[in-house]
């Protein structure tokens, strides 16, 4: 006769083989599908990296081209003429004058309003920040570029 231990050994062996067979029916196709998706992830990552590198190259070249055009435009513009202020200089007070009260220092008298005497007037140049930056770019370029 067959002992009880041998009988249960063959029962467990049979169950293990049957369950392993049915699980392999699911695992092997799913493993193949995951392999296909992994190939897709790698290939799309490669394509994404290549398209980014190409776009970066296009951007750098376009930026360099636009900078050259801007330098040429800066060389062709006439320097801005400094205009005299409309008010005579005698009415303007220097900023460094310590006798002018500052509105920020008048915390002891909170009820006092800011008057014309409290405001510091400075002559303002007619040039804008863009015009100054173009002149700076033209000076740095050393007049290398000429439009033809």
UniProtKB/Swiss-Prot annotation:
Recite the UniProt keywords alphabetically.
Answer: Membrane, Phosphoprotein, Sporulation, Transmembrane, Transmembrane helix
Pfam families assigned to the protein according to its UniProt record, in alphabetical order: Osw5
Keyword Membrane annotated: yes
Compositional bias, Polar residues, is annotated for 93-109
Regions of this protein lying in the Cytoplasmic compartment = 1-7, 51-148
What Gene Ontology terms describe where this protein resides (cellular component)? membrane
Q: Please give the residue ranges the record annotates as the region Disordered.
A: 80-110
Q: Does the keyword Phosphoprotein apply?
A: yes
Q: Which residues form a coiled coil?
A: none
Q: Which residues lie on this side of the membrane: Extracellular?
A: 29
Classify the protein's membrane topology as the record does. Multi-pass membrane protein
Q: Which GO terms describe its biological process?
A: sporulation resulting in formation of a cellular spore
Membrane-spanning segments: 8-28, 30-50
Q: Which residues carry this modification: Phosphoserine?
A: 102
Residue ranges with Low complexity bias = 80-89
Q: Where in the cell is it found?
A: Membrane
Spell out the family assignment given in the record's similarity comment.
Belongs to the OSW5 family.
Q: Outline what the protein does.
A: Involved in spore wall assembly.
What is the protein named? Answer: Outer spore wall protein 5
Q: Which organism is it from?
A: Saccharomyces cerevisiae (strain Lalvin EC1118 / Prise de mousse)
């Amino acid at each position: 006769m067959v002992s009880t231990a041998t009988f249960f050994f063959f029962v467990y062996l049979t169950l293990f083989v049957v369950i392993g067979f049915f699980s392999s029916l699911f695992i092997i196709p799913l493993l193949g599908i995951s392999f296909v998706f992994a190939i897709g992830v790698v290939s799309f990552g490669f394509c994404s990296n290549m398209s980014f590198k190409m776009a970066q190259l296009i951007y750098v070249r376009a930026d360099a081209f636009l900078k050259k055009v801007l330098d040429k435009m800066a060389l062709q513009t006439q320097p801005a003429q400094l205009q005299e202020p409309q008010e005579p200089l005698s009415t303007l007070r220097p900023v460094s004058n310590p006798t002018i009260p500052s509105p920020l220092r008048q915390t002891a008298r909170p009820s006092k309003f800011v008057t014309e005497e409290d405001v510091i007037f400075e002559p303002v140049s007619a040039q804008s920040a863009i015009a100054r930056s173009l002149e700076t770019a033209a000076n740095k370029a050393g007049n290398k570029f000429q439009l033809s």
